[in-house]
Amino acid sequence: CSRSDGWCGKTEDCCCPMKCIKAWYKQNGNCQNTISAIWKNC
């Protein structure tokens, strides 16, 4: 996993979902439509 505030790609959604969620709340991420989609796609 990369920096905690890094951009979230598909691989990192599965690798570090919490990192992706944090970035999404900061509007720095490009997560799936919903948080649950991160888990479903893994």
Swiss-Prot record:
Keyword Cell cycle included in the entry's annotation: no
Highest taxon in the source lineage: Eukaryota
Any GO CC annotation of this UniProt entry: extracellular region
SUPFAM superfamilies, per the entry: omega toxin-like (SSF57059)
Record localization: Secreted
Organs and tissues of expression: Expressed by the venom gland.
Statement: the UniProt record of this protein carries the keyword tRNA processing: no
A GO term for molecular function: toxin activity
Transmembrane segments: none
Record key words, sorted: Disulfide bond, Ion channel impairing toxin, Knottin, Neurotoxin, Secreted, Toxin, Voltage-gated sodium channel impairing toxin
Cysteines paired by S-S bonds: 1-15, 8-20, 14-31, 16-42
Family the UniProt entry places it in: Belongs to the neurotoxin 06 (delta-actx) family.
Protein's job: Lethal neurotoxin. Slows the inactivation of tetrodotoxin-sensitive voltage-gated sodium channels (Nav) by binding to site 3 of the channel, resulting in repetitive firing in autonomic and motor nerve fibers.
Identification of the protein by name: Delta-hexatoxin-Hv1b
Source species of the chain: Hadronyche versuta
